[in-house]
Amino acid sequence: MPQVTMRQMLEAGVHFGHQTRYWNPKMAPYIFGARGKIHIINLEKTVPLFNDAMNFISSVAQKRGTVLFLGTKRSARETIKEEAERCGMPFMNQRWLGGTLTNFRTVKQSVARLKELEAGETDGTFEKLVKHEVLGLRRERDKLEASLGGIKDMNRLPDAIFVIDIGHEDIAIKEAKKLGIPVIAVVDTNYNPELVDYAIPGNDDAIRAVQLYSRAAADAVLEGKAAAPHAATVREEEFADAPAEDAKPARRAPAKKAAADKGEAQA
């Protein structure tokens, strides 16, 4: 399991929450106190939950499952892409398209179109077209690449989702919960940790903190892959409608009754 110390979390600013006026009472057990109207997260509570989350990610990868890395806010985009690519997992870092999970068959059609356009660029098809047609096709390709490029090799629904900011990615989390896909997420002091299966109490804005979470998640994936049995894998169905059963968490999260506080805040 990736080793991240409390000192590393302190140096990355993981302990800085949002302004006290925006807090969610469900986060009370994880808050140490306040400093200058900013909540301070208790890292003694964060560390074990962080370790649980990383262990789960590793277990999914060990079973040859897929973990979708998700972070579309500006501070997370670059890191999410880099770390997902490093560990060979799909990602979305620009904009979540509604229905990406719940309407996955349609999304796959868009992915197929993206691959068709990419092939046309390399096999000489574009050379047979007039200039304005080529420009139009390239614009279409670039648009699809920006929104779907990170998941174009994801042939079935993911077995888990790793999320940086649950408020920013609330639609994705609702889709995942509807389909029973486990969610591992960083939860700041202004949101409800009960909305996800594996909550990591921590700063979801600071770039260094985002890098720490994402790097650890990628390391957990690589560790799980390294421990995976080398037996031949069973062929995956092209359009699976649900995640693998054995990748679901062993324990159930408490009932999700409270809605997340949608107040905007600056850490």
UniProtKB/Swiss-Prot annotation:
Keyword match Ribosomal protein: yes
Pfam families linked to this entry: Ribosomal_S2 (PF00318)
Disulfide links within the chain: none
Annotated region described as Disordered, given as residue ranges: 232-267
Sequence ranges of Basic and acidic residues compositional bias: 258-267
Keywords: Ribonucleoprotein, Ribosomal protein
Gene Ontology MF annotations: structural constituent of ribosome
Origin: domain of life: Bacteria
GO cellular component: cytosolic small ribosomal subunit
Record has Ribosomal protein as a keyword: yes
GO BP term, example: translation
Family membership: Belongs to the universal ribosomal protein uS2 family.
Protein name according to UniProt: Small ribosomal subunit protein uS2
Organism encoding this protein: Stenotrophomonas maltophilia (strain R551-3)
Upper taxonomic lineage: Bacteria, Pseudomonadati, Pseudomonadota, Gammaproteobacteria, Lysobacterales
Gene name per UniProt: rpsB
